[in-house]
Curated annotation (Swiss-Prot):
GO terms for molecular function: rRNA binding; structural constituent of ribosome; transferase activity. One of the primary rRNA binding proteins. Required for association of the 30S and 50S subunits to form the 70S ribosome, for tRNA binding and peptide bond formation. It has been suggested to have peptidyltransferase activity; this is somewhat controversial. Makes several contacts with the 16S rRNA in the 70S ribosome. SUPFAM superfamilies: Nucleic acid-binding proteins, Translation proteins SH3-like domain. InterPro entries: NA-bd_OB-fold, Rib_uL2_dom2, Ribosomal_uL2, Ribosomal_uL2_bac/org-type, Ribosomal_uL2_C, Ribosomal_uL2_CS, Ribosomal_uL2_dom3, Ribosomal_uL2_RNA-bd_dom. Keywords: Ribonucleoprotein, Ribosomal protein, RNA-binding, rRNA-binding. GO terms for biological process: cytoplasmic translation. This is Large ribosomal subunit protein uL2. Belongs to the universal ribosomal protein uL2 family.
Length: 274
């Protein structure tokens, strides 16, 4: 994987930094694992904007990813690595011994031809998945479930991983990249290794148009709006906003705690680093 800085042949190319991976499949994705993906433009069923800065972008298909890794005891081979427009991580097309194909998240170091397996009898090896009760303490894992059988929810983006730091009774304690320590049931599954494509963070799009290709619309500052549109709006000439920064709905936006799910507080051993 190479990081390439483009020559400044135009203003739009001057700041472009590309991450090039020659191992990725250059053809079309596997048709049997594609699904329709409709664009909402950030609107809900009433037609009102519920998510700002969303709209446009290139047409995409959704890749059906196997986040459960529940095909136990059947060896599989990595056929190829692919680009996925729906996530920062790359994905791997897996062929099982019984002929079934599935997409999984591509782990760091994974290559075409590698052998992987799921289940308690799988060896401790990058790409293999098993319940946390069978994973040695100190192991680095990704694609971790929060509820047994629900599918992976933790550490799924490019370069992400968590570390298993303890196991006590029915729960395993994980250290997340944010510094948070969290308890997860030991029957939840995880995959060895960390998610690949960690160089994604080095990428620079270089121009506004590249953001629009990805379906991201411009962000307008509150102080540039009218009073009817934002609490920071209005005033004669340029103003500082006149108050501490808030969202368009008046909620403080700099360090204000918004977590309200007390039901799951008992699973958080230590809050994330500030």
């Amino acid at each position: 994987m190479a990081v390439i800085k483009c020559k400044p042949t135009s203003p739009g190319r001057r700041h472009v930094v590309k991450v090039v991976n020659s191992d990725l499949h250059k053809g079309k994705p596997f048709a049997g694992l594609l699904a329709k993906k409709s664009k909402s433009g950030g609107r809900n069923n009433t037609g009102r904007i519920t998510v700002r800065h969303v709209g446009g972008g290139h047409k995409q298909h959704y890749r059906l990813i196997d986040f459960k890794r529940d095909k136990d005891g059947i060896p599989a081979k990595i056929e190829r690595l692919e680009y996925d427009p729906n996530r920062t991580a790359h994905i791997a097309l897996v062929l099982y011994a019984d002929g079934e194909r599935r997409y999984i998240l591509a782990a760091k170091g994974m290559q075409a031809g590698d052998k992987i397996q799921s289940g308690v009898e799988a060896e401790i090896k990058t790409g293999n998945a098993m319940p946390l009760r069978n994973i040695p303490v100190g192991s680095v894992v990704h694609a971790v479930e929060m509820k047994p059988g629900k599918g992976a929810q933790i550490a799924r983006s490019a370069g992400a991983y968590v570390q298993v730091v303890a196991r006590d009774g029915a729960y395993a304690t994980l250290r997340l990249r944010s510094g948070e320590m969290r308890k997860v049931p030991v029957d939840c599954r995880a995959t060895f290794g960390e998610v690949g494509n960690a160089e994604h963070m080095l990428r620079q799009l270089g121009k506004a148009g590249a953001k629009r290709w990805r379906g991201v619309r411009p962000t307008v500052r509150g102080v540039a709006m009218n009073p009817v549109d934002h609490p920071h709006g209005g005033g004669e000439g340029r103003t500082s906003g006149g108050r501490h920064p808030v969202t368009p709905w008046g909620v403080p936006t700099k360090g204000y705690k918004t977590r309200s799910n007390k039901r799951t507080d008992k699973y958080i051993v230590r809050r994330r680093n500030k």
